[in-house]
């Protein structure tokens, strides 16, 4: 994904989505925030703790960490820090600010695999690695 795409169109507030890999869980007021590493943040209305209701999904590629304070969600997106203004009664979140290049880039961050992999030819200037596309290689591996 190019840097332009990541920073202009990739972050979106969407309807609730199915939960994949579970990450960090935060409670703020009557809401729960569940990160899905690499994907974004699921937001739940927790007015009734016995039956939390999904209210929205904030799509944030490369997300790993989140914090919530005084009506704001702070989240990383690969190398950037994002600040959202939360309007939970209206089930919305607005990206207020993006602090670019706050973290070191890790090209392996979103590559969930149990197998050791080496990715060649990563050009950080072109964007971020969001998935693996296996290719056939005849190269011999040193033992």
Give the residues covered by each predicted segment:
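Feature marking well-ordered beta-strand scaffolds used for ligand recognition
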Residues: 1-143
């Amino acid at each position: 994904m190019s840097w332009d795409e990541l920073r202009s169109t990739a972050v979106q507030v969407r309807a609730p989505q199915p939960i994949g890999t579970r990450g960090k869980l935060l409670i703020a007021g009557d809401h729960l925030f569940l990160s899905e590493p690499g994907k974004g943040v699921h937001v739940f209305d927790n007015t009734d703790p016995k039956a939390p209701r999904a209210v929205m999904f904030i799509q944030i590629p490369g997300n790993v960490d989140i914090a919530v304070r005084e009506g704001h969600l702070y989240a990383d997106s690969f190398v950037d820090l994002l600040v959202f203004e939360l309007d939970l009664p209206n089930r919305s979140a607005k990206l207020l600010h993006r602090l670019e290049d706050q973290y070191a880039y890790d090209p392996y961050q979103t590559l969930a695999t149990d197998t050791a992999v080496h990715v060649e030819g990563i050009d950080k200037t072109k964007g971020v690695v969001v998935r693996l596309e296996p290719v056939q290689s005849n190269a011999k591996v040193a033992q």
